[in-house]
Amino acid sequence: MNPEKFTHKTNETIATAHELAVNAGHAQFTPLHLAGALISDPTGIFPQAISSAGGENAAQSAERVINQALKKLPSQSPPPDDIPASSSLIKVIRRAQAAQKSRGDTHLAVDQLIMGLLEDSQIRDLLNEVGVATARVKSEVEKLRGKEGKKVESASGDTNFQALKTYGRDLVEQAGKLDPVIGRDEEIRRVVRILSRRTKNNPVLIGEPGVGKTAVVEGLAQRIVKGDVPNSLTDVRLISLDMGALVAGAKYRGEFEERLKSVLKEVEDAEGKVILFIDEIHLVLGAGKTEGSMDAANLFKPMLARGQLRCIGATTLEEYRKYVEKDAAFERRFQQVYVAEPSVPDTISILRGLKEKYEGHHGVRIQDRALINAAQLSARYITGRHLPDKAIDLVDEACANVRVQLDSQPEEIDNLERKRMQLEIELHALEREKDKASKARLIEVRKELDDLRDKLQPLTMKYRKEKERIDEIRRLKQKREELMFSLQEAERRYDLARAADLRYGAIQEVESAIAQLEGTSSEENVMLTENVGPEHIAEVVSRWTGIPVTRLGQNEKERLIGLADRLHKRVVGQNQAVNAVSEAILRSRAGLGRPQQPTGSFLFLGPTGVGKTELAKALAEQLFDDENLLVRIDMSEYMEQHSVSRLIGAPPGYVGHEEGGQLTEAVRRRPYCVILFDEVEKAHVAVFNTLLQVLDDGRLTDGQGRTVDFRNSVIIMTSNLGAEHLLAGLTGKVTMEVARDCVMREVRKHFRPELLNRLDEIVVFDPLSHDQLRKVARLQMKDVAVRLAERGVALAVTDAALDYILAESYDPVYGARPIRRWMEKKVVTELSKMVVREEIDENSTVYIDAGAGDLVYRVESGGLVDASTGKKSDVLIHIANGPKRSDAAQAVKKMRIEEIEDDDNEEMIED
């Protein structure tokens, strides 16, 4: 025996068989070991040939019988160092070598080894024992070589028998298991026309990811099964080639090319009865390319041009441009078929066609309104992906959510079960106690437990009954799907008796059983819901995008209606601005906003420190419960023309192209946001040109060519233009109307008309009056009080102290900001000194009053928490009447617990 004259597969088989003999401690290496090694490989030729000859379970039976025979062989312990081959094994190999020479093979292939093995009397008897005739196994093995009898001319030659079966799957065979294809008739007809050509009969499907390119080929497979194709395509096999399987495990140089050649040879031998489908056809270009070898595309080209190979390719537009168009010789052999994204109505039709498949898989019922919602919401809110893929994913995930809820216990039962467990633990603990109180409690617990069990039992029974009904419906739907597949198979084989039995017998029985079970659920079903409705789809959209599209709950309705009032708690005055913003949010959440524009776009004008930026922060806090979720762009950083690229990302060829823009990336990740362009007048005019498209159509294309959706964002721009006119109006030099007109004149002079014309509203913020500034001072003092509250310290402040702070810090030109600066410098600094000097203890109160030319600070024990009642006071205690220093301590004591309201009924912040 010369191993060099054996194929790699033969050598591997003999080595495995030898290892089997060594591990078992057998004295000889026999044909039985060889049979054991061959049958243990599930993808090998031997088990496949036995299954074809004797039925589906024949290979498993043969493996069992061979293993039993191996166990009966005598074994030695320890095993011998060298195990000789038995005379019967040598005869097997000699017979195989004789057959090899007669066939003209250069290497001994596995199929010849099997043919030699089948001549062995012991193996023949074992196969007869399981009812498999060796003659039939031989004929199945011979079929592997094909009609012309392929020759094995290399060490890897026998790996390519049945190459199409090994490296592909027949879509026509699996047509019944594929999802139904709705629409796409024009594309399928175009593919059929190209396939019917004499030469260059190779269509390539190109389109965006997720538009249904592979579905077109699956639709063709289903038409071939039904016979709805021209004569040239009847009875053809549509094989989907797995390029990964072709490349995987090709260890030796030339092995990949040999595999591919064998696939192409099988296609050629089929004489037009095989059409190859290569998904992601760009992978063919460069596949298997190493130094000194050619890639797969060059092996395809000659056959593609001559029309010997009919091939359907599929790839995305980007990859087609990137890979296929570069190889003009490869590209010209394919005819392009563009697969466009379906419209929303077409997507709804596709979803209706798939509805039954998803209902059967998940065991739920999908409402038609949910399908319409999925198509509409995905088209509107999920950008960067394409229909119908994103709509199908929405339906699938919504069904999965409902299914998960069905498989878990209802909340009502779960709560009662937990309570029952707690009472049982308490019962066991009390049973050991001897005192009267425990015995009395024991009687109570037993009674509670009995009541709970009485309540729980009917609920559990109802839940189990409903669960069983839903599970049975799911099982029947899956059975119906399997029967429909069997029906298609029977019709394809023209087994009319079987088809009639299925259509008018089994399938009708299953459908009537499903209808009966679904009919019983018409009563009010409080325990479990198996329906997937529009609200489930909306919930998934909200989870994916962060955009609240779910139906408005009662709490949220109240929040939206009271949005303006809550914004006023943080922003003093500025009614026009607050109302404009809150109304825009209300329109958006009610679903009546303009669909193709941002939720709202505003230009806030006014002097510094009047609350323009504060309103944007307050809005972000109300919408997202966190003011930091504001997308803030400081326009003072965009004073040069080239800085526009920082907003939308650098163009190709520039450093930072891969990073994306500061604005576009932030909005792409969180489409539902508040965008603040602060100090907008300081930016270069080129920046405004970029924003025109955002304000008009709610979209912007970034540096990488991706379209970013701004339709769910609120855009706020702030500017100080014309602030001096408003200050003149405040001091009485001119009327406020004249001042506003002057401001608008300045704005029109600075900004282009096309920008101003696209804004929803231009809001002029009025300078803050003295009373409004006092409210601001109180809000700032609350901020200090919140910081102190972390130490358990309450803060009390008199009106006199607030008036003193205002008198010291008020500057009409700078608005409210000087108040914060003065407070930080004076009040916070003094409090910090008192903390460091340990004058302020935990759970004490600091009260601030106006003294002679300065603020006076007093500390008293008893702070946020009252020791006697355990109640918390407000973090900021406001002393409205402004008691003098001598009376202040008593006033603080009285007001520590109760809530104090100012003259404007403004609520204090609670800890």
From Swiss-Prot:
Changing G815D: In hot1-7; reduced ability to acquire thermotolerance. Disruption phenotype: No visible phenotype under normal growth conditions, but germinating seeds have greatly reduced basal thermotolerance and are unable to acquire thermotolerance. Faster degradation of HSA32 (at protein level). One of its GO terms (cellular component) is cytosol. Residues 6-73 are annotated as: Repeat 1. Changing T599I: In dlt1-1; normal growth and development under nonstress conditions, and normal chaperone activity and thermotolerance function. Compromised positive regulation of HSA32 during recovery after heat treatment. Residues 85-147 are annotated as: Repeat 2. Induction: By heat stress and oilseed rape mosaic virus. Regulated by HSA32 that retards its decay in a positive feedback loop (at protein level) during recovery after heat treatment. InterPro entries: AAA+_ATPase, ATPase_AAA_core, Clp_ATPase_C, Clp_N_dom_sf, Clp_R_dom, ClpA/B, ClpA/B_CS1, ClpA/B_CS2. Residues 164-410 are annotated as: I. The keyword Nucleotide-binding applies. Residues 403-500 form a coiled coil. Residues 3-147 form the Clp R domain. Keywords: ATP-binding, Chaperone, Coiled coil, Cytoplasm, Nucleotide-binding, Nucleus, Repeat, Stress response. It comes from the Eukaryota. Residues 532-723 are annotated as: II. ATP binds at residues 207-214, 606-613. GO terms for biological process: cellular response to hypoxia; positive regulation of translation; protein unfolding; response to heat. It is found in: Cytoplasm, Cytosol; Nucleus. One of its GO terms (molecular function) is ATP binding. Over-expression of HSP101 partially reverse the sensitivity of 14 day-old seedling to heat stress. Belongs to the ClpA/ClpB family. Molecular chaperone that plays an important role in thermotolerance. Together with HSA32, required for long-term acquired thermotolerance (LAT) in plants and naturally high basal thermotolerance observed in germinating seedlings. PANTHER family: ATP-DEPENDENT CLP PROTEASE, HEAT SHOCK PROTEIN 104. This is Chaperone protein ClpB1. It comes from Arabidopsis thaliana.
